[in-house]
Amino acid sequence: MPPKIYVIHENSEWVVPLRSAFAELNLPFEEWYLDQGVLVYSTPPPLGVFYNRMSASSHTRGHRFAPEYTSTVLAWLDSHGRRVVNNSRALQLEVNKVAQYAALRTFGIRTPRTFAAVGADNVIQAASHFSGEFITKHNRAGKGLGVRRFRSQT
């Protein structure tokens, strides 16, 4: 029998096609719904393959700390040498636009002029560096949530 596949997520909608595919292929799997939990670090994780489907937009579904908890679980899996698809690095990129842009640039992919600003006053200050239209996007959102277009700084 193949090793069990553990699907790490916090959004059941995203797992529907996986459930069907795994059932069709007769692959054993288990879902780890990580919107919250307790990790006993001294206990080794089960053997298997871990597929990380955690999303930066989890907070939009009421799961504010799911990425942080998933990061903890991934570190635990890594410390035991478990195979993880979409590992800690993937999660880091998921929750950090600057890290995403840096990774894209290492492959020669251009990214827009970017300022990282935290706090309302700092966002306004960063906006003053643009002479025309600009777009804001926060680190944690999917489906275009939080994207705003401004025609000017005022």
Please provide the spans of the model-predicted regions.
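Extreme N-terminal starter segment of soluble prokaryotic enzymes
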Residues: 1-6
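Conserved N-proximal alpha/beta basic substrate-recognition cap immediately N-terminal to
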Residues: 10-113
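Active-site nucleotide/adenylate-binding loops and adjacent lid/helix of ATP-dependent enzymes
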Residues: 79-81, 88-154
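Small/polar loops that bind or transfer phosphate-bearing groups
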Residues: 7-10, 151
